[in-house]
A protein has these predicted regions:
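N-terminal single-pass transmembrane signal-anchor helix
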Residues: 1-24
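N-terminal helix-rich module
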Residues: 16-38, 42, 46-49, 53, ...
Length: 143
């Protein structure tokens, strides 16, 4: 009798937690996407700062590949300085003009446009990063 009562309570608890687990998973995926967007934005801002304040005057370039939508790299003086591999569920796409983004010595971007991050488990949501002309300001929008 106690065994049946225990199994019944466990079954009831599992049924009550099941809808919540989908909601928790969705929230986890949203946070994963946001974190990736802010990581990319921070890397772009760091590139701009390095170009402005490094005495060596290296050129930093962010490169996004057409073939591999799960990574990007930053090159310094045409050598890989940083390579970032994204989660397999997150894809990165960008406009053609901004596939190779760098900043000049005044902090102005050489290309303007946007990057889009999407999560495979969240078809109705994405994060958009835009690089503003002249200032090079990076903005992150969630849609």
């Amino acid at each position: 009798m106690e065994l049946l009562l225990t199994l019944g309570c466990l079954g009831l608890a599992a049924v009550m937690l099941y809808p919540g687990s989908k909601m928790l998973q969705r929230q986890y995926y949203r946070q994963q996407l946001r974190y990736t967007a802010y990581l990319l934005a921070a890397d772009i801002r760091q590139m701009q700062q390095q170009t402005l304040f490094q005495p060596e005057n290296y050129t930093y370039t962010l490169k996004v590949s057409d073939k591999d939508k799960h990574s990007y790299r930053i090159e310094r003086a045409h050598k890989i300085w940083k390579r970032v591999r994204l989660d397999a569920d997150i894809s990165l796409t960008c406009e053609k003009e901004i596939k190779n983004l760098s900043y000049n010595e005044n902090g102005n971007p050489t290309a303007i446009g946007g990057y889009r991050l999407e999560h495979r488990q969240l078809p109705d949501m994405y994060c958009q990063l835009t690089v503003q002309p002249v200032t090079g300001r990076v903005s992150v929008y969630e849609r």
